[in-house]
Amino acid sequence: MYGHAAGIGSAISKIQAEACFNTGIVAGESGAKGLFHTQDTSSVKNSYNSGTVTVADASKSAYQIAYGSNFTVESSYYNSDPGTAEPGVDSGVTGKTTAEMKTDAFADLLNEVLATSTTEVDGIKLADYAWVRADSTNGGYPYTQVREFLSWADVAKIQTEARLRLTGVS
């Protein structure tokens, strides 16, 4: 444990995250956040934290999702089982039990938002991905993978994007 800990990341500058998750333990000495900690205006959308979040100093903050100046959260979820930390934000976040998070219904709920995403980075569209879940993968929690496609043209497009990512060509 050291200082402030975050399940995915911590930054002084702006964070914009979508379709992220943390299932691991996050433990800090003077603060802990399940997904992100930042000092700037930031946002998290369609994400979840199912991991345990703890802080050594009981007078310090431990939050399931995020904390920061002007942090906006949309359509995100945290583990609400007894004994877990508070979400850390007032709106845009919903508690779900471990049992609820390990269901196909939870993956479907996440997909309702992901399917309409307009986020695109380096030609890669988040809407081309889907939340899926299997008992034997990721501890039974949802994770993202490329959607199933009905045409070979769509498959070729995704393969080209993957090849560009591997080679660093943009």
Name each region found by the language model.
Residues M1-S170:
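Predominantly extracellular beta-rich ligand-binding scaffolds that present long acidic/polar faces
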